[in-house]
């Protein structure tokens, strides 16, 4: 029997605005020593909030504090509430096989119940995954074809017709410039019926 001592429980509660029409799911947060705030995507080396800054404010540093060392959690939450974007992860408990945040070295001990999340956000019509492990876990729970990165596939959940979007990882380990990642995310946000998001002017 494997030791229970190394099991990490998810440190955050699901972020589920009542008006959420989009649920973004990663795999699991990085180790606390890599956090710059108590929220999702807390690592300064992860570009998720820079991607959001480019798309919604034409400024990749929009969600950084003036010292550039911390993300501004309150500004992030304000945007997510206004836009109806929910966040959580596909693993609720993991064991780290190495001392890093790579999905490759995460052993999932307990999966998140995706259907339970969706039942709490009845207006949600799309799920976004940002990595292979998250995509695999969703496909174990929901009957849906695996999307190619940058595309989506339809699926049914109860009385809802939904889509699963597979986005490129916001990790800098994923070899794609942030501008190209932002362009792919922008297409997804527009497809989920957000106000039309144009490319920033140069």
PLM-predicted stretches and their roles:
Residues 148-154:
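An amphipathic alpha-helical core segment
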Residues 58, 201-202:
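A very general structural signal that marks isolated residues within well-ordered alpha-helical segments
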Residues 110, 181-189:
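Binuclear metal-dependent hydrolase catalytic cores centered on His/Asp/Glu-rich metal-binding motifs
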Residues 195-200:
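Conserved small/polar residues in nucleotide/adenosyl-binding loops
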Residues 191-193:
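Acidic, proline/serine/threonine- and glycine-rich low-complexity intrinsically disordered segments
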Residues 2-126, 132-147, 158-175:
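A polyanion-binding, active-site-adjacent surface
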